[in-house]
């Protein structure tokens, strides 16, 4: 396949027969593309004298290109129990795609990567706080600080008093709203703008609390469609993980990496 004008990637995910690629080109501009990846496997060459490639065991091989990743999987399944039929190549499609684009080293430019620290605050009710899955308490404030600028973006329901700020290091962009729904709607409009979309989300306990709470609160107020826009591909994947002795649902915002301080 032809190479993308991709200097480096920040996320590659698979969705059916497509690879969802995000990164930056050689001019420092963000790239976000869906690629129909056609995998290549290698079979023992019919004429070894004309073979241009060899397997790691020295066997002369020739390429076989598939129309889709699912076709390649079906091919492997068909011949997996035939001992004399050996298939060479990498059936892990994302690493294979990465190597096709970057056969040598990858030169990352860290200053371009948009790393955003996320923190939410929820209102305490008379009965206390709910967990991230139930998300019963209203969100009363959201703050995002990204590495590519010096601005703290905060959405809140109460007035902001600059005189009690603990630091003057950052420019404060504070937006006050009458209702939680209005606040979340404005936050999502800001989040999905191409200039604001993160490459990486970080923060304290964001994987177990902030992200799942925000997703589940959005689902309560606006349905799953509202929550999906947190992903640049509108795809959110969930998985069950054991945390502190109990199972908990965590979410992947496809296209955005998560680096929780608690995991580092």
Indicate where each model-derived feature is located.
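The two-metal-ion catalytic cores of nucleic-acid processing enzymes
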Residues: 1-264
